[in-house]
């Protein structure tokens, strides 16, 4: 991989240990993936935030960078943090403080685009959360690979990333056409579709036909579910996403999605309400319109839920919900908005037995953790819940 004179000096340690170590990570990645050079990035989004995921070894890794004086050189935000007991939270707060000392904005969310970290079409970025990567690539038309925590941090420190993968035009072309014959209209429909397609395709770049999403949130959930059951980091939707016109250049294989395919997924996540003791919405983190809808549905229900309803959202969305009165309504009916956190990366085994959710991503992970899972649209969950 070609390096400029300045980049060579960084790699040689002339600009300090922190930049040298970050550059070593980027050069290793570039060599592995055959990148021709490093390219500047506009922003970064760093995973490896929950203490559940990184442990003490991760804290030592971050501490080494901080003690070497590492500072990020582009606007950088974090993935959600975990929540747990007092001992866990002490470690979790240490992780956040280490990131803060590197100049990272400690807003811990998988939807940074609902706040200040909103890239423009064509921007090169280095993001690591799978659903955020999918949203940035597919809906915003920005360009990022699905980075790991260390590589996104290294890119944030250096301000550059290796030029390979989805940064290149040729790798953003569709590799398979997905002809959707099934009826797909609601949030949960898109969630189930994403679950099925991710599991079926793995790491392709799908081009969807016959989808007419009413809300951007539907596409957010489609990408999140595909990123959970597969490794899909970019997709195109005919007539909807910004790069669909240039996405097909060759004759491609077509797969068809029928109602029966989605029915099979739904039926696999229909555990009885007697096994469910929590409703979880906000995977990826909920938007303000999603929070508003939940407040309205709870008000229509007219009586408090007997099991808790947790909504995970970014700090920015929570602040708006507070100001607009949605939070007060939600709390009146046994709900709570939890900012900057994620139950998937929290040690909650033993706290609850089963979850009800509208998220295919949540359904996938919590089933793998051994929880009972019920998957449906939030309207039905709030209406049917005890």
From Swiss-Prot:
Pathway of action: Isoprenoid biosynthesis; isopentenyl diphosphate biosynthesis via mevalonate pathway
Gene Ontology MF terms: 4 iron, 4 sulfur cluster binding; lyase activity; metal ion binding
Keyword Metal-binding: yes
EC number(s) from the headed UniProt entry: 4.2.1.182
Cofactor note: Binds 1 [4Fe-4S] cluster per subunit. The crystal structure contains a [3Fe-4S] cluster and corresponds to the inactive form. The active enzyme probably contains a [4Fe-4S] cluster under anaerobic conditions.
Named cofactor requirement(s): [4Fe-4S] cluster
Example GO biological process: isoprenoid biosynthetic process
InterPro entries, per database record: PMDh-L-like_dom
Chain residues that bind (R)-5-phosphomevalonate: 48-50, 53, 63, 79-80, 129-130, 361
Catalytic activity: (R)-5-phosphomevalonate = (2E)-3-methyl-5-phosphooxypent-2-enoate + H2O
Binding-site residues, [4Fe-4S] cluster: 110, 283, 342
Alphabetized UniProt keyword annotations: 4Fe-4S, Iron, Iron-sulfur, Isoprene biosynthesis, Lyase, Metal-binding
Enzyme class label: lyase
Function in brief: Component of a hydro-lyase that catalyzes the dehydration of mevalonate 5-phosphate (MVA5P) to form trans-anhydromevalonate 5-phosphate (tAHMP). Involved in the archaeal mevalonate (MVA) pathway, which provides fundamental precursors for isoprenoid biosynthesis, such as isopentenyl diphosphate (IPP) and dimethylallyl diphosphate (DMAPP).
Family that this chain belongs to: Belongs to the AcnX type II large subunit family.
Self-association and partners: Heterodimer composed of a large subunit (PMDh-L) and a small subunit (PMDh-S).
UniProt cross-references to PANTHER family, sorted A to Z: DUF521 DOMAIN PROTEIN (AFU_ORTHOLOGUE AFUA_6G00490)
The protein, known as: Phosphomevalonate dehydratase large subunit
Native source species: Thermococcus kodakarensis (strain ATCC BAA-918 / JCM 12380 / KOD1)
């Amino acid at each position: 991989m070609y390096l400029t004179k300045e980049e060579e000096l960084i790699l040689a340690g002339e600009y300090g240990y922190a930049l040298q170590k970050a550059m070593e990570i980027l050069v290793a990645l570039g060599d592995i993936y055959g990148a021709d050079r490093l390219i500047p990035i506009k922003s970064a989004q760093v995973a490896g935030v929950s203490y559940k995921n990184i442990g003490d070894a991760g804290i030592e890794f971050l501490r080494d960078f901080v003690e070497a004086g590492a500072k990020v050189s582009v606007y950088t935000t974090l993935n959600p943090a975990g929540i747990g007991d007092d001992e866990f939270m002490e470690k979790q707060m240490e992780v956040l403080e280490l990131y803060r000392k590197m100049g990272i904005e400690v807003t811990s969310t998988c939807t940074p685009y609902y706040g200040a970290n909103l890239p423009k079409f064509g921007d090169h970025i280095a993001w690591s959360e799978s659903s955020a990567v999918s949203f940035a690539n597919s809906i915003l038309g920005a360009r990022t690979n699905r980075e790991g925590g260390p590589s996104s941090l290294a890119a944030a420190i250096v301000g550059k990333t290796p030029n390979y993968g989805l940064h290149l035009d040729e790798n953003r072309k569709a590799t398979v056409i997905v002809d959707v014959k099934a009826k797909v209209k609601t949030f949960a429909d898109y969630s189930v579709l994403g679950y099925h397609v991710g599991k079926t395709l793995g790491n392709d770049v799908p081009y969807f036909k016959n989808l007419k999403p009413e809300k951007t949130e539907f596409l957010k959930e489609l990408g999140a579910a595909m990123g959970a059951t597969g490794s899909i980091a970019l997709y195109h939707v005919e007539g909807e996403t910004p790069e669909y016109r240039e996405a097909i250049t060759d004759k491609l294989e077509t797969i068809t999605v029928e109602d029966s395919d989605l029915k099979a997924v739904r039926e696999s996540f229909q555990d009885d309400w007697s096994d469910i003791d929590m409703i979880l919405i906000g995977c990826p983190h909920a938007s303000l319109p999603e929070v508003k809808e939940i407040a309205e549905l709870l008000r229509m229900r007219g009586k408090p839920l007997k099991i808790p309803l947790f909504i995970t959202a970014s700090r920015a969305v929570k602040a708006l919900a507070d100001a607009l009165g949605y939070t007060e309504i939600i709390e009146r009916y046994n709900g709570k908005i939890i900012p900057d956190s994620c139950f998937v990366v929290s040690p909650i085994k033993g706290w609850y037995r089963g979850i009800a959710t509208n998220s295919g991503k949540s359904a996938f992970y919590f089933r793998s953790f051994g929880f009972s899972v019920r998957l449906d649209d939030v309207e039905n969950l709030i209406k049917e819940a005890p």
